[in-house]
Amino acid sequence: MAAEGARRPVIIAGPCSVESREQTLATYRGLAACGCVDMIRGGVWKPRTYPSCFQGVGEVGLEWLAEAKAETGLPFGVEVANSRHVEAALGAGADMVWIGARTTGNPFSVQEVADALRGTEVLVLVKNAQMPDTGLWTGAVERMLAAGVGPERLVLVHRGFAQTSGNEYRNPPVWHVALEMRRRFPELKMLCDPSHICGRREGLAATAQKAADLSYDGLFMESHV
């Protein structure tokens, strides 16, 4: 994973959830026109707390992402939480998969995904677990490495941590936890997800700047029309 130009941060952007073909294509056309986005992202399966909440459009969303890739020339990535997701994503031509915070917190799910990725060449992003626990995050990384996902294809994503009291952030960054992961895995790139950390537009620029000041390698952001 690399951006063109010396030291330019990597930018991965796209909607939290793809909702329709029209929304997906319009979003990615806009991102491609920016000229600064390296990869497009979009969720098609959503791990919601309640079954009554939107669960994502499912595999049809992969078709829209693949179409956006074909039109814009930008590679695409999708969140996966089990082996079926991995198989469907790779079958649709995904260039990247990411493991979300809820999945990182479940070693059984992480191992299932790791086993499904064995022998593939896809880029793999691992978000921190919901709680500020370096153990769960470390364990997820170690499972990926053990499955043959080399450090050149494995990326950490810092998306903040669940809070139990009022805070200016939706998911407080607790920067020292992420920095400890960088100390443990200096060979891995790390991206910041300011969208999940902030939960709103206010604070995005400051959070992204903080990540840049800490020498993060880029941003993993939500963007949609």
Describe the residue ranges of each PLM region.
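Catalytic beta/alpha-barrel core
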Residues: 41, 55-57, 73-86, 95-109, ...
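Glycine-rich, proline-tolerant flexible connector loops at the mouths of alpha/beta enzymes
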Residues: 38-60, 224-225
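Catalytic alpha/beta core domains of metabolic enzymes, predominantly
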Residues: 4, 109-225
